């Protein structure tokens, strides 16, 4: 079956893996998913990611990050904002701040996928893909 929204699929896999306290999770490989994983790694929400598999079966392996003895997930919430049925765009002046700057909005811009902080520095707006905090 074809996946109509691979970004939502990625975020759901991350959310489910965090709830079950898994160390890693597998996500189908795409350029967009790789870019989102890179932003999550740069912002400190995941330890690392790598590519595995061959051909059509290639996927990303994300190492999730936890803190403390009780393994509290670093990613507390992941919300999809712009969806295939309703795209949400923002200009550089109206870039959202998630939880007063504690969270991250992941933005797809003309200069690539980046966090809201990087988009402010670059002075670009774009499609708001998701919020992570």
Swiss-Prot record:
Functional description taken from the UniProt entry: One of the primary rRNA binding proteins, it binds directly to 16S rRNA central domain where it helps coordinate assembly of the platform of the 30S subunit.
Gene Ontology CC terms, in alphabetical order: ribonucleoprotein complex; ribosome
Coiled-coil regions, chain positions: none
UniProt GO BP: translation
Lineage: Bacteria, Bacillati, Cyanobacteriota, Cyanophyceae, Synechococcales
Family: Belongs to the universal ribosomal protein uS8 family.
Alphabetical list of Pfam families matching this protein: Ribosomal_S8
Superkingdom, taxonomy of origin: Bacteria
HAMAP family: Ribosomal_uS8_B
Descriptive protein name: Small ribosomal subunit protein uS8
Matches recorded under InterPro entries: Ribosomal_uS8, Ribosomal_uS8_CS, Ribosomal_uS8_sf
GO molecular function, one term: rRNA binding
